[in-house]
Swiss-Prot record:
This is F-box protein At3g59150. SUPFAM superfamilies: F-box domain, RNI-like. Transmembrane segments: none annotated. It comes from Arabidopsis thaliana. Residues 12-58 form the F-box domain. InterPro entries: F-box-like_dom_sf, F-box_AtFBL13-like, F-box_dom, FBD, FBL60-like.
Length: 475
């Protein structure tokens, strides 16, 4: 019995016996407040707090309610003390995240914290989320010689952009709802020139918080995400992308009047979400529109991508403001639709045969959130756009589908209607190399699943290797 007691391990010392480097890594996964609580355990744990490479300050976590009001004194004192200790000990800080969304902290105090992390601590990764009114951020932040990643948002107003600002180390920048003070006219080109090593850029704009004029030029940029929530302003007169090194593009905006100087020499993946304004499209009672302008140039510019994702609105823009669908000679994966319940099924099924016909190497087709059939009477709508006259019919592309390289078909939002079965019949009856069909059904019990599977299994298949999988849609 005594021997058994001696052999029993002491689990209470397991964590304490870990090396400091590993403990610091574990503490980095906690919020800074939670990590600070461990300092009461012993002097060793208190010293570890000064060695954590990641600091996460969030006033929504640290502020405590008292008599119906939030106290900001504790938050301010906590950040002041910890940053001061880190500067005194010259301990390395890799990443700092500062979230001030409750108000009550003076802007000058926040600026002091930011400059301390950049200037004195030499932080590599800085994330700022200041959301208690309009906050003015000085451009001294961009003079850092160590900063590699920077995220700025939301509702932060930047000071005047000086021409001598250069940050040679920054390679990732996020501008989330930012603005330049006093309406300064700052060209996108100036920002890109300030960061000669920039490889990743994310920009989010709204009808108020915006500054991009539609021109982007960079030799180093590899990833660009641009999203505009502005649906009230006029479209940009011209959009150009002089980005020969760009590999990934995620572009969401109103359709511009024109697109030119598009250099996508290295582009592999493109995601387009293009919106038409009321002035760009005038719908008639039969749902056919007459518009001016052309997005054909944009689609020609991305024709060499391997992965293409088009939202329902982008499909509408292509149909109403496009004149020709280019050949996508390298396209392997095509994703159409979105998780949002909108989009015209008429336009979708009008364009799909031509998209498939012009994507000879396509291996994976993903259809998301769109109605998978054309409503009764829509087939007879008279063509009144250049694109509608050029669209292939399913009968026309049947031969090209039979030689298609498509191996995977994935459909979400499937309901199992007879119209959907007719469309599935076209796929299964023509795609000779199809290997997997994944169908996601929203409301499905075991009985519904069996019925859907039974209907699909009865459809004729030209591919003997095709495996049909029916699954419940979780999202």
């Amino acid at each position: 019995m005594e021997a058994n007691k001696k052999a029993k391990p002491s689990y209470g010392d397991v964590i304490s016996n870990l090396p400091n480097d590993l403990l610091c890594r574990i503490l980095s996964y906690l919020s800074t407040k939670e990590a600070a609580l461990t300092s009461i355990l012993s002097k060793r744990w208190s010293n570890l707090l000064l060695s954590i490479p990641i600091l996460d300050f969030d006033d929504s976590v640290l502020l405590k309610p008292q008599k119906g009001q939030r106290k900001n004194v504790f938050f301010k004192a906590f950040v002041d003390r910890l940053l001061s200790q880190r500067v005194e000990t010259s301990s390395h800080v890799q990443r700092v995240s500062l979230k001030c969304r409750q108000g009550g902290v003076e802007p000058d105090c926040v600026i002091k914290w930011i400059l301390t992390t950049v200037r004195d601590l030499g932080v590599l990764d800085l994330s700022l989320c200041i959301d208690f009114g309009i906050f003015h951020l000085p451009f001294n932040v961009f003079r850092s010689k160590t900063l590699v990643k920077l995220r700025i948002g939301t509702m932060i107003r930047l000071s005047q952009f000086p021409s001598d600002v250069v940050s040679p180390t920054l390679n990732s920048l996020v501008l989330d709802l930012v603005e330049f003070r006093d309406g300064d006219k700052v060209e996108f080109r100036q920002i890109l020139l300030a960061f000669p090593s920039l490889q990743s850029l994310r920009v989010h704009e709204s009808n108020k918080w915006k500054f991009w004029n539609g021109s982007a030029s960079s030799r180093t940029l590899k990833s660009l995400v641009y999203r505009s929530d502005d649906d009230s302003s006029a479209p940009k007169p011209c959009v150009s992308f002089d980005t020969p090194s760009l590999v990934y593009l995620d572009y969401s905006d109103m359709v511009a009047d024109k697109y030119e100087n598009l250099k996508f020499d290295s582009l592999v993946e493109a995601r387009l979400d293009l919106h038409l304004t009321a002035f760009q499209i005038m719908r008639k009672p039969n749902n056919i529109g007459i518009v001016s302008g052309d997005v054909t140039t944009l689609f020609k510019g991305i024709r060499n991508v391997k992965i293409l994702c088009l939202s329902p609105d982008a499909l509408e823009a292509l149909y109403y403001r496009g004149e020709k669908i280019p050949m996508f000679n390298n396209l392997i994966t095509l994703s159409l639709g979105s998780d949002k319940p909108h989009g015209s099924p008429f336009i979708f099924w009008k364009l799909l045969p031509s998209l498939l016909n012009n994507s000879l190497k396509l291996e994976t087709l993903i259809i998301k959130g769109l109605v998978h059939y054309v409503a009764e009477g829509w087939e007879g709508l008279s063509p009144m756009t250049p694109m509608s006259r050029l669209c292939f019919s399913w009968d026309t592309v049947s031969d090209s589908l039979s030689s298609s390289a498509m191996k995977v078909l994935e459909i979400s939002g499937y309901k199992g209607t007879w119209q959907e079965l007719n469309q599935m019949k076209r796929f299964l009856g023509n795609l000779s190399r199809l290997e997997v069909v994944r169908v996601y059904h929203k409301a499905m019990d075991d009985k519904e699943r069996i019925n859907v599977m039974f209907d699909l299994f009865l459809l004729p298949k030209v591919s003997s290797e095709c495996d049909i999988q029916v699954m419940k849609e979780t999202a």
